[in-house]
Swiss-Prot record:
Family label: To S.pombe SpBC4C3.08 and SpBC4C3.09.
Topological type in the membrane: Single-pass membrane protein
GO biological process: protein N-linked glycosylation; protein O-linked glycosylation
The protein's name: Uncharacterized protein C5H10.12c
GO cellular component: cytoplasm; Golgi apparatus; membrane
């Protein structure tokens, strides 16, 4: 057995020197125990030491718990008499809980706005979802000047900033956020394998940052964050995660081309109160993010710009089948659209048929219960 000379011992890297010293002390202490199994004691102490060493000296690596993974969908008050999103949410729950080819091993939580009918909440629970009631975030709650919005905000659209509360759900390690107008075609549990973003960016090319102009000011500005305003250092925002699929138009190639702008209908995130507060502060000025043309989607694309401090992660484009065509149907993991609109010319009839088949299956499974 080779020996470690004093010179070699002293030349060890600092962390190895410290670790070796602590282990040596443990060994010497253990050997003087009377009537104890010193081998087992040593193994137990080394295991404990190893765990503590990882936690204290390798903060870049977080221990993820699959038991803290979940799907999550926002449910708002209806803006019309017909609450199509109620039925769509039930279909989503059924696909994740019971459908043979799409059911997940992870739970699904519905973020229901306070004020949603109690019977709807109870129905979601009977269907197999857990429900978290949240207070809405109105545009007036975070925006300084709502007159800078690009359009008149509909009653339902007005509630979409509430979706940002996904970042407050820190009881979970990862959340797959999914809109109710997405029809799941295949099991998508492997989306949770997407890793956190640990690598901190040291410098930015400011000329590549998102640009904007202020009202009554033609000067072109670039989005530049002041972390003092957030009350935290930049390093405290890592690791983070926002993974999504490039947004695409109705007429796109197969496979779709990458774009710098993502669709927020399906995202994988790591919840973070720091990022939640950061996003709200960015949201004060809609002129910085397309005049809030797409509400929370526009805001999140600014907060997680590819050229910023926290670039979003690209997912396989078929996790979120925006504007699905007939030719790409075999490839899709999900199809994204309001397929309950019978007579719509936006989508191939087969997708409307797929959605109504899923809806009928859900009703049959629950024996046509409606309340």
């Amino acid at each position: 057995m080779s020996r470690i000379s004093l010179s070699n011992f002293l030349s060890l890297p600092r962390y190895k020197f410290l670790l070796f010293s602590v282990v040596l002390i443990i060994v010497m202490t253990t050997l003087v125990f009377n009537g104890h199994d010193y081998k087992q004691t040593l193994n137990d102490r080394l295991t404990s030491l190893k765990n503590n060493f990882v936690e204290e000296n390798d903060n870049a690596v977080l221990k993820e718990e699959p038991g803290k993974y979940t799907y999550m969908s926002l449910f708002t008050m209806p803006s019309t008499e017909e609450d199509y999103y109620f039925n769509a949410t039930r279909v989503l729950i059924h696909r994740l809980k019971y459908h043979p080819t799409t059911k997940s091993k992870y739970p699904i939580h519905i973020l229901a706005l306070r004020g949603v009918d109690e019977w709807k909440i109870e129905r979601f629970r009977k269907d197999g979802a857990s429900v978290i009631v949240i207070d809405p975030i109105a545009s007036s709650d975070i925006v300084y000047d709502t007159s800078s919005f690009s359009q008149e905000i509909s009653a339902r659209y007005e509630q979409m900033f509430s979706k940002l509360r996904i970042f407050e759900q820190i009881q979970f390690d990862k959340i797959c956020v999914i809109d109710s107008d997405i029809l799941i075609m295949k099991n998508i549990d492997d989306i949770f394998d997407t890793p956190y973003m640990y690598q901190q960016i040291n410098t930015l090319n400011y000329t590549r940052l998102p640009s904007y102009t202020k009202p009554d000011d033609d000067t072109v500005y670039h989005f530049n964050e002041d972390f003092k305003e957030y009350g935290a250092s930049r390093s405290e925002f890592y690791p983070y995660l926002l993974a999504a699929v490039s947004d695409r138009g109705e007429h796109h190639s197969i496979p779709p081309e990458d774009t710098p702008y993502f669709n927020a209908g399906l995202m994988l995130i790591r919840p973070s109160e720091l990022h939640f507060n950061r996003i709200l502060k960015i949201g004060r000025f809609p002129y910085m993010y397309e005049n809030a043309k797409m509400m929370e989607q526009s805001l999140l694309n600014l907060a997680f710009s590819l050229d910023g401090w926290f670039p979003w992660t690209r997912l396989d484009p078929y996790y979120n089948g925006v504007w699905p065509s007939i030719d790409e149907r075999p490839l899709l993991k999900t199809a994204h659209g309001k397929f309950w609109n019978i007579g719509s010319s936006e989508f191939a009839p087969v997708y409307l048929a797929d959605w109504y088949a899923a809806y009928g299956e859900m009703l049959s499974f629950h024996k046509y219960e409606t309340h």
